[in-house]
Amino acid sequence: PGDEFLTIAPYFPEYQVFVESAGGTLTAVPADPEDFQIDFAAFAAALSPRVKGVILNSPNNPTGVVYSEQTIRRLAQLLTEKSAAYGHPIWLISDEPYREIVYQQEPLPWVPSYYANTLVCYSYSKSLSLPGQRIGYVLVPPQAEEAELVYAAVCGAGRALGYVCAPSLFQLVAAACAGQTADMAVYRRNRDLLLDALREMGYTCAQPEGAFYLFPRTPEPDARAFCQRARKYDLVLVPG
């Protein structure tokens, strides 16, 4: 209770619910509005002694941005410096349900290789194209500070929330499909189709390098009102 967490905006809105339900506060640091990459000047300014954790989502929901190795290295260096200055670890929670849904050639950086105090959250539901079927894991790297205690805390948190075991059927599915993915070419085709159409109609939209979202700029200041009007055309949009 009372701890602060940072994340990059725009972000998956349930992050705020997760943090606040545990008595913490979530501060969103706006990304660079042109490419949605981390604005390191703003991020460093927000990284106060109250911050105990950072939530990172790459590939990102909702922008589709992917953070490069250079970005992860820079973030790791900053968190290492601030952890030493403040006298406590700043945990990096790397939320990676879209890890396999990428449209670039180079592999995604494995975050624990750059920053020891990283917790990796993964879900099979996206890579297998089974959204809604919640099965995955939280990885606590052995090199993390007090790794055994943190591992026990993660297990205890799941039990406290009522999640003792994943559904038995999907435990078998995950085991049988290890190393497999759905056809990623379908996602790329849909991305290109929608992105090209939006740009032809005059919308500004950064090209997603991962996940299955588009985050176009609304043609008017009130994004919420724009999304409400879109419902008349059976379009479900989320303002950001």
Which role fits each region the language model picked out?
Residues 1-240:
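PLP-dependent class I/II
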